[in-house]
Amino acid sequence: QATSVRSEITRTEVERRMVGFARTVLQQADTALGSSTDLMNSARDLVLQAGNATLTASDRASIASEIRSLRDELLTVANTRDGSGAFVFGGQGSRTAPFVETDGAVTYVADPGTQEVGQDVRVSTSLDGHAAFMSVPDGAGGRQSVFDVLDAAVAALSDPAATAADVQAATKAAIDGLDAGLASVSLARSTVGGQLRMIDQVE
């Protein structure tokens, strides 16, 4: 009987630690997604500004540089680590960055996982970075990443030979892509919120 009680106490303590860890990771994911929203909104504002017909090619190039900086910040946020050093969007306990940039293109190389935090209760402690950042409709029936959207905007706005029509088309495509990307991140945050509510019920 004493052994059974000790085992139950040990199991309860382990579950308590697992719940605490899962909560921390999910809160860090929520913070990262919130920062991503801010960065994408800032980029959207710049794209709108770049669409002003009175701007010169030099003005647009300057805006493109700002958008590029925001894009790089977004990549850093997407590779956020949790308190244990694992990547929040990188899969269960991953020590490998989930978002990898090669020759200017960003790819996602992770497999999100779940963790049991209570008897028969599992929550996602590694969020699906692909769904959040890499699955934006491209307007032609395919998918692209939010990084692709920003890269295309930077390229178009940096082109000194771009015509007014080119700029208009590029800014519209960027706004559409960023709006879709913001919706994806918002959905990811909703998922995190649901997981946190599940943890509240376990506690």
Task: Mark where each language-model region is.
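Amphipathic alpha-helical polymerization modules
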Residues: Q1-S94, A155-E203
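Amphipathic alpha-helical coiled-coil/heptad-repeat segments
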Residues: R44-L150
